[in-house]
């Protein structure tokens, strides 16, 4: 029996015109940008900002057909931290094309003067930027295909380049390319990727883009789990629906957008977005508090035997540890962005981590630590070392990370596989070493010489020995 009431949009979708073309119609996009835009369309003055979805991958077929059958509509279940859900039927997706069958329609849509913003959720890897060089990889097979076959593209870069070529030829005017992916400086990354592609293919178009296309940075935040078949069944049962493509997410949402649009924009600030001149302060807050805290709780929680984040955060010891890290270690280095209550932000983070309905896997937070430490942990640790701060909590994190990588066994004797793909052969030699200080020379930590920082090495060595002899949780109890 249905237990949730569905909040349905009240506007006439026939009165809505697509002004946004979106690449990557996945769950996060449908819980974030489409959620905000569907609410925005309740305002009659904003009805020229509907969304046209562009799905270009062969693997998109199932979702494309499900959404097409439902005329672009679907239900979003917003899971409250208080255990109560809000359900919405969203209608912002007014057009939808699948590139495998409708390539020309997508290309023509990019050239349509009604389309004034192209938005992207193509994932971090989708920008095709080399981790080693930071440059766009022109030798990628699909990219090479698109460079040689401009009217038969496979990638978002190829689609956008050919669509903009048509836009330039028809005089349809400027356009904004807005990344909504969860990565730092996402607009700068999008600019590097798309401009590198176009410069390699069409110098005239590249010059036109320099004058007519902007790439605003934005910061996005909303936990949106993958929807498994059992989730679809559960959501439809709870909501009394027969939705082939439902989505569920947490009740927190944040979207900070650099106000740098080439051809106008929706009034997203009226539905909760924060428009700003610079997203850097917001990114720093998120990286230093949300992402760093995720990393902090991941390895100790996993070593203690927790496999779900919400279960770990309902352990008072871990919750206290995370909050001490936020308050004592990190807050001095995080200037609050304009109109932001930092205390409320931290409290909300702890509540979000403990939300049982959208629980994350601890293993996912542990995955690829080599990529996370340089971005989330090292910048503030370097400042803390320089300021001669107490470093016991961060030292404990490093000791727990070493134990996780070296011993593959938790406090309960349960063995596990480690997934840290960017560690090098030399890194693994340092992990295997019986000298704990060798671990501090790992490539993810190379931005500073941790072994020379005695205010760090002393507590670190203590933590290494304690975790090995007493276990991760007993050690944590002693430092709280």
Which residues fall in each region the model found?
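Substrate/ligand-engaging "lid" and interaction regions
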Residues: 1-480
